[in-house]
Every structure is written in C-alpha cells, then in structure tokens.
C-alpha cells in the first residue's frame, strides 16, 4: 500500500501533467513546434525536480539551486525551438510557454497549487484570445 507521501507525489505529478496538457493542447491544435507531449514532459519534469529538491535534507544543501538549474535547462530547450525564417522569428511564444510551464511545474512540486492553476488559467487566457487578436491585426496590415 502507498504511503501518504507517495500518494501526494503521484497527485503532484498528475496535476502537473494535466496543467501541461491544457497548455500543450493549444499549441498542438495550432501545429506549433512543441506540442502537448513536450509541454507535459516539461511540467512533470519541473515538478519532479521540485519534489526532489524539497526532499533533500542537510545543512550544506541549497535547494534553490535545483530550481535555478531547471530554469537554465529550459532556456536551452527554448533556444532550440526558436528559429528565424526570412524576416520572421518563429517559436518564440512556444519557448516562452515552456519557460512558464517549468515555473508552473515547480509551483506544483512545492505545493503552490493555487498559484500553478491560476498561472495556467492566465496563460490560456493570453494564448487563445491572443491568437485571434493577432490574426485580426495581420489582416489589417
């Protein structure tokens, strides 16, 4: 039988997967460079790193280093998504999303569920209407 701690870890990973899936689905539907699986993996990975960092005990342990390393790693991942085509830069929004999803995952991992859910909601409120507004602006040009 699973302990309370193990159940909490599974719940955190499941919450991270759902939040990552919600944001990733929007990218997937618009055929963007990083789809739903990538978004879920980033969110779950960040959550797991947060869980591990909060579980480490000791006087010489600086758990904030793990969170900063996650941000650094996501920066490299995001850099691989951004590219220039003619006079346009592509993948910038997707890279920014992955960066925010890592923060959402870290929030879930340390138990800041409200913050993670609120941030996911705000991200979706920016992405969905934002795409519609962008199309309208481009039509007027």
Each language-model region and where it sits:
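Alpha-helical transmembrane segments and their membrane-interface boundaries
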Residues: 1-66, 109-118, 128-141
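Hydrophobic transmembrane alpha-helices of secondary-active transporters
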Residues: 18-23, 75-83, 105
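Short, amphipathic, aromatic/basic-enriched membrane-interface segments that mark the entry/exit
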Residues: 32-37, 60, 82-93
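Small-residue-rich segments of transmembrane alpha-helices in multi-pass membrane proteins
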Residues: 41-51, 72-76, 96-109
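Alpha-helical transmembrane-segment detector that highlights a single hydrophobic TM helix
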Residues: 59-87
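Interhelical loops and loop-helix junctions of multi-pass membrane transporters/channels
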Residues: 63-67, 92-93, 97-99
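Alpha-helical transmembrane segments and their membrane-interface exit regions
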Residues: 73-78, 123-132
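Membrane-helix boundary connector in multi-pass membrane proteins
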Residues: 86-88, 102-116
């Amino acid at each position: 039988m699973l302990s309370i701690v193990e159940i909490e870890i599974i719940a955190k990973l499941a919450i991270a997967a759902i939040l990552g899936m919600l944001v990733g689905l929007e990218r997937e539907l618009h055929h963007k460079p990083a789809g739903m699986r990538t978004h879920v993996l980033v969110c779950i990975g960040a959550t797991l790193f947060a869980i591990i960092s909060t579980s480490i005990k000791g006087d010489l342990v600086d758990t904030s280093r793990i969170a900063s390393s996650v941000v650094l790693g996501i920066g490299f991942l995001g850099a691989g998504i951004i590219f220039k085509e003619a006079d346009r830069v592509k993948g910038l929004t997707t890279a920014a999303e992955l960066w925010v999803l890592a923060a959402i995952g870290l929030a879930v991992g340390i138990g800041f569920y409200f913050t993670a859910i609120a941030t996911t909601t705000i991200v979706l409120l920016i992405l969905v209407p934002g795409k519609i507004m962008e199309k309208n602006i481009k039509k007027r040009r």
